[in-house]
């Protein structure tokens, strides 16, 4: 009876020992894509950054910003939030603009949408960590600025991302991918960002 009692007391702890690492693993993966810079600040930096991209030339009609969302609620909220923040600006690099929120299907499909819409800026919401390298491959050769919402995104292949360092917002630039996507940033601007090569 005593052994049975001890066993029943141990069961909840055993379950916790088994379940807790799984929960923590899930938290770790979720944290990898956490947005640390507020969307309002991100929008402000995107607008400012566009002024320093020498290849972001005016095209007929408004400048198209594709906002790519995943299947999660957090991704959809991010998409609507950044679209709203960007719409508060009259122009991006002197040109009127339109934001289009689209669902991610595949890297190849995104390339087709960029070409079809003549998009010059692509914003990647959370949920794209695994797909960013293939997205980077597909966007290579196009003239498009890809912006990742999370700090990990530039290291995986977006041209730009955002982070917090010593309490300050930091703009991350993947210089190699910038060259692949014909993003030509002024050298003076590169002095104030963290360059990822």
Predicted regions and their residues:
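Short hydrophobic alpha-helices and adjacent helix-cap/hinge residues
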Residues: 2-7, 11-16, 25-197
């Amino acid at each position: 009876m005593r052994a049975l009692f001890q066993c029943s007391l141990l069961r909840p702890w055993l379950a916790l020992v088994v379940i807790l690492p799984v929960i923590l693993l899930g938290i770790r993966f979720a944290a990898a894509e956490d947005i640390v810079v507020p969307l309002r600040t991100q929008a402000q930096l995107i607008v400012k950054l566009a002024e320093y991209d020498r290849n972001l030339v005016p095209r007929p009609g408004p400048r198209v910003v594709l906002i790519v969302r995943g299947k999660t609620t957090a991704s959809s909220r991010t998409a609507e939030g950044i679209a709203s923040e960007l719409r508060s600006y009259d122009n991006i690099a002197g040109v009127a603009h339109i934001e289009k929120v689209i669902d991610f299907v595949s890297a190849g499909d995104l390339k087709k949408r960029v070409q079809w819409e003549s998009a010059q800026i692509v914003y990647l919401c959370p949920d794209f960590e695994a797909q960013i390298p293939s997205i980077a491959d597909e966007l290579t050769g196009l003239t498009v600025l890809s912006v990742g919402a999370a700090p990990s995104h530039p290291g995986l292949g977006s041209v730009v991302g955002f982070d917090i360092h010593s309490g300050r917002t930091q703009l991350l630039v993947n210089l190699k991918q910038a060259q692949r996507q014909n993003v030509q940033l002024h050298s003076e601007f590169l002095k104030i960002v963290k360059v990822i090569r």
